UniProtKB/Swiss-Prot annotation:
Bias-annotated ranges (Pro residues): 66-79, 614-623
Pfam families: Herpes_UL69
Domain of life: Viruses
Compartments reported by the entry: Virion tegument; Virion; Host nucleus; Host cytoplasm
Region annotation Disordered: where it falls in the sequence: 12-82, 115-163, 444-749, 774-811
Residue stretches in coiled coil: none
Chain intervals with Basic residues compositional bias: 514-526
Name of the protein described by the UniProt record: mRNA export factor ICP27 homolog
The UniProt record lists the keyword Transcription: yes
Composition bias type Low complexity, residue spans: 32-49, 132-147, 568-579, 591-603, 688-699
Source organism: Murid herpesvirus 1 (strain Smith) (MuHV-1)
Length: 841
């Protein structure tokens, strides 16, 4: 009985073979009888006892421990019914899908299956072929897995970014981006080329999310080599840390967050090493630092809120900045509050600045977790799997700039410091460096201080400066490498301000040849006819007067030396009339004839007499003949001087006048006459002072003649200006053949200044060039003055939006050459300063 009780309590032994007992076999406990080994109660035979699965005889006392009876093998498991219901529901949904949706679903299924197997799917393979390959790989006892590990699968795992070749515009259901947007691939490839740089394009939320615009950015990032991608990331890092204003930082933040939003909407795998994912953490700190430049204690103070100190404390916690000092015993409470702040939805904050910074912090935390996990796992990683606050769902493209700049301009307070800081915060700010310190007290090895001259250069505090470049001709010295023709624009580049800051500089490849030649001709004629503009008309007329008077005074001084008491012949009078009709073109004759005087001495006196009889053009610094007789000059330079040698030294006198004129050109004031003018006037005064005593009785006649001379000079100047304007208009409207025709002798003096510079002054290789505005990194000469646009040039801006430089067209007759500008010259180059914003790099 004792043995039976133990067995009853312990149940059957572990070595008891139930299968043998069921089939009638003899077990190891066969020495015991059937009744001794097992006791069955009334109504329960052995088969029912075994089928019930009871392991101990006291099951009647523990009925609640009795297991349920096993179902028949032919009946399906309970979960099979659930799968049938799910498949039936899914089948109904598939019936509602269209052909395009079904194609997208096939691509998604193929991508998921390939991702589950850990290998790269073939884009061209059909889903059925892919399924068969996957099934065969499962039934090959890991042979396929080993081959993948040593073949193409190893290359896939060594990739720095997940493969997104199967994510196409069609598979994602996207549209092509509008044609008015710049090409993303060209923007990234030509990011260091100033010619192809455009203003940032304003793109809407629908265009960014529903087109393939950002998908092209992502694919280009994946295709870049690791070295180029790292350089691009460093460029972005410096751009974020050196942003000139809060507006730029907010725009960069929206750019990064929009890129992440696109990945979340279309469920793209994240590349933790691309441009925008790598720099999202810097955006958070840059935004907080820019906001912290303002008076946050006043900006965050809202009526009815918790106070500015509490809101500022929350703002610092969002940016993971050290909390502000709190009272004793409040460290744990501050830590708990910061934990709650980081887990709150971004839009749950009541202040717009807090919401904007919370959105950036949430995106940065998601990407940071993915970047840390990518160091240990191969991925792929998706934004949806790490968004625990719903920040990616609540964000809309451009939301950061909207939250910040909808609140800051409307802030009103009585704090003067807050208003000054807010004004600076809403506009780009520049450096206020007044002096640069340099240590010149370095000691010698003997210990004595030695004063040295400054060697440190002042930092570039104004990086936004336009850079000018010019293209030299073939005859000049090649010290500066010329820029390529494709990067050349006009000498006065115009940017349409009505286009919202867009760059209207066209591409030479898309411009017709006629339009190209037309603007080339216009660019050259504009430098010749500088006096057509209203701003520089007076200055150019004064310059023309000084230049034309230079040649006339030389001939007049030579006539005085030969004999001023000779009378005028009728031929001289007739030549004077002809030259008066032709304008001031004949003024350059004295210089040409004086150079030929040594070879042809017999013709020098005639030519000088013809030149002396010519009346000078009007000028503010050239007095009339009568006024020169009445007003002797009081300056030492205009005092009477002895007569020059009669006719034996005309060349020496000419050289002396030219040398003195060149020396005086760089030291005289803008309103002062040149040396040639003063000496010519002094020669006239000395010659006329001898005959002034005999002509004193006719002073009234001289006054009347003076008035008539002034009227004639005024009429002549008006006629010349009108003819000059007509000439400029004809040149702008002329064809290429008309522009190539040589200029006849009866033309006006509109191009006299350029021709006379070539005759009177030696050609300088530095000045023989055609200036065109470009962004090539070349320094502008200090003698060139840069002027802003005048309001009166609006019509000219509309007419000449884009001017091109054609290297095949050379200046005609060497007329278009810019002389070296001195501090007193009035030759002014008009340059457009709107290109300064393009030289920030």
């Amino acid at each position: 009985m004792l043995r039976t009780g133990v067995k009853r309590r312990l149940g059957p032994f572990a070595g008891y073979d139930e299968d043998d007992a069921a089939t009638g076999g003899v077990s190891r406990r066969s020495k015991y009888s059937q009744q001794q080994s097992q006791h069955y109660y009334y109504g329960h035979n052995q088969s029912s006892y075994r089928d019930s699965g009871a392991s101990h005889p006291n099951w009647k006392r523990n009925a609640h421990l009795m297991p349920p009876p096993l179902s028949s093998p032919s009946s399906p498991p309970p979960q099979y019914d659930k799968n049938i219901a799910a498949l039936t529901h899914l089948n109904k949904k598939l019936d509602c899908l269209g052909p395009d949706d079904l194609e997208c679903l096939k691509a998604m299924i193929r991508i998921r299956e390939a991702r589950a197997q850990g290998r790269r799917p073939e884009p061209s393979s059909a889903p059925s072929i892919l399924e068969s390959s996957l099934v065969s790989s499962n039934n090959s006892n890991n042979n396929t897995t080993l081959s993948l590990g040593g073949g193409g699968g190893g290359d896939y795992h060594r990739q720095t970014s997940p493969d997104i070749r199967d994510y196409t515009t069609g598979s994602l259901g996207l549209c092509m981006f509008p044609m008015d947007l710049p090409d993303p691939i060209k923007l990234l490839e030509n990011r260091y080329t100033d010619n192809d740089r455009h203003a940032p394009a304003v793109v809407t939320h629908d265009e960014l999310i529903n087109t393939n615009y950002l998908l092209l950015f992502r694919k280009h990032f994946d295709a870049l080599p690791p070295e180029e991608l790292r350089v691009l990331v460093q460029d972005r890092t410096f751009a974020i840390n050196n942003a000139p204003s809060l507006d730029v930082v907010a725009a960069m933040a929206d750019e990064n967050l929009t890129y992440v939003k696109f990945h979340r909407v279309h469920n793209l795998p994240v590349n933790p090493k691309d441009l925008y994912m790598s720099t999202l953490g810097l955006i958070k700190y840059a935004t907080f630092n820019k906001l912290n430049l303002g008076e946050l204690s006043c900006l965050l103070d809202s009526p009815g809120g918790g106070g500015s100190d509490r809101e500022y404390h929350i703002l610092r916690q969002i940016a993971n900045k050290p909390a502000s000092p709190c009272r004793k015993g409040g460290s744990s409470a501050a830590a708990a509050a910061s934990f709650d702040v980081l887990r709150r939805p971004p839009l749950s904050f009541k202040h717009p600045l807090q919401q904007a910074l919370a959105l950036i912090a949430s995106f940065a935390r998601i990407v940071g977790v993915i970047r840390r996990r990518s160091l240990r796992h191969s991925g792929p990683f998706f934004i949806r799997d790490f968004d625990d606050t719903g920040a990616t769902d609540s964000y809309r493209c451009g939301m950061i700039s909207e939250l910040i700049f909808d609140y800051l301009p409307g802030h009103r307070c009585q704090n003067e410091i807050c208003r000054v800081k807010l004004k600076k915060l809403l506009q780009p700010y520049t450096s206020t460096l007044f002096f640069c310190a340099y240590n010149n007290t370095r000691k010698h090895p003997n210990g004595l201080p030695a004063r040295r001259s400054p060697e440190r250069r002042a930092p570039d505090a104004t990086p936004n400066i336009p850079r000018l470049a010019y293209r030299r001709s073939a005859t000049t010295s090649p010290e500066v490498e010329p820029a390529p023709p494709s990067r050349m624009t006009s000498s006065s580049p115009r940017v349409d301000s009505r286009g919202g800051g867009g760059d209207r500089r066209g591409d030479s490849s898309s411009t017709s040849s006629n339009h190209h030649r037309h603007h080339t001709r216009r660019a050259r004629t504009r430098s010749t006819h500088d006096s057509s503009s209203s701003g520089s008309r007076r200055r150019s007329s004064a310059t023309d007067g000084r230049r034309s008077r230079r040649g006339s005074r030389r001939g007049e001084a030579q006539r005085e030396s030969n004999g001023h008491h000779s009378s005028k012949s009728p031929s001289t009078v007739s030549s004077t009339t002809v030259h008066g009709q032709n304008g001031a073109r004949g003024d350059s004759a004295p210089s040409r004839k004086s150079q030929q005087s040594q070879q042809q001495p017999e013709t020098t006196s005639k030519e000088s007499s013809k030149t002396a009889a010519m009346p000078p053009p009007p000028s503010p610094c050239s007095p009339s003949p009568a006024s020169r007789e009445r007003r002797p000059s009081k300056s030492p330079s205009s005092s009477p001087r002895p007569h020059d040698p009669p006719s034996g030294e005309p060349a020496d006198a000419e050289k002396e006048l030219a040398t003195a004129g060149d020396e005086d050109e760089g030291v005289r004031s803008p309103g002062e006459c040149s040396v040639a003018t003063r000496r010519g006037s002094s020669a006239d005064e000395s010659s006329d002072s001898s005959s002034s005593s005999s002509d004193s009785s006719s002073s009234s006649d001289e006054e009347e003649s003076d008035v008539e001379d002034c009227r004639e000079l005024d009429l002549q100047s008006k006629r010349l200006e009108e003819a000059l304007e007509e000439r400029c208009e004809r040149d702008f409207e002329a064809d290429d053949e008309e522009f190539a025709e040589p200029i006849e002798e009866d033309d006006l003096h509109c191009s006299l200044d350029m021709e006379e510079d070539i005759e009177d002054e030696p050609l300088d290789p530095e000045t023989e060039s055609v200036w065109t505005a470009s962004v090539t990194p070349l320094a502008a000469p200090p003698s060139i003055r840069i002027l802003d646009h005048e309001p009166g040039d609006a019509e000219e801006e509309e007419e000449s939006d884009t001017d091109f430089y054609d290297e095949t067209d050379q200046p005609l007759n060497k007329r278009i050459h810019l002389r070296s500008a001195t501090p007193t010259d009035d030759v002014i180059m008009e340059c457009d300063l709107s290109y300064s914003e393009m030289d920030s790099d």
